[in-house]
Regions:
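Secreted/extracellular ectodomain signature
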Residues: 23-146
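Bacterial Sec-dependent N-terminal signal peptides
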Residues: 1-26
Length: 146
């Protein structure tokens, strides 16, 4: 009986360590390369700095995977920044060129007094950025909120 207990304990402990080791056996590049060529990805962004980073991520991913869907959903203060900060114009143009969709929350626009006409023509809007993200998830998008 004691031997059976020790054997079961050994198997359980061994399987835990094996699982942990095998989960970390992938290299960083293996993990990055697991992004699907035809995948659907979205990032929820609250500020200009994260918007810039999201655009550059979208550019990199779309360069390697042109069929990929990539969206950036903007909430909070970046809704105002996108309309007023000239330094963001080049990021909007990169997004348009690469086929990265930018969607701005109309609730944030209303809060900051921004109109759709204040934006670049390629910018889309949604009544509620959070509801839009839920919709993307329901449609198979992998999402990140910053």
């Amino acid at each position: 009986m004691k031997n059976q207990f020790l054997m079961i304990a050994f198997i359980l402990v061994g399987s835990v360590f094996y699982t942990a080791v095998s989960a970390q056996s992938l290299s960083v590049s293996d993990i990055e390369n697991s992004v699907k060529n035809d995948g659907k990805y979205a990032i929820l962004v609250p500020n200009a700095r994260y918007f810039q980073a999201a655009v550059m991520t979208g550019k990199e991913l779309k360069t390697n995977n042109p069929k990929m869907d990539f969206e950036i959903v903007l909430i909070s203060a970046v809704a105002k920044d996108l309309a007023t900060d000239e330094s963001l114009k080049s990021f909007i143009e990169i997004s348009e060129k690469m086929g990265v969709r930018i969607v701005v929350c109309e609730s944030a626009m209303n809060h900051f007094g921004v109109k759709k006409s204040d934006y670049h023509p390629s910018i889309k809007t949604t009544p509620d950025g959070f509801a839009y993200m839920f919709g993307l998830q329901e449609n198979g998008y992998k999402t990140i909120s910053l």
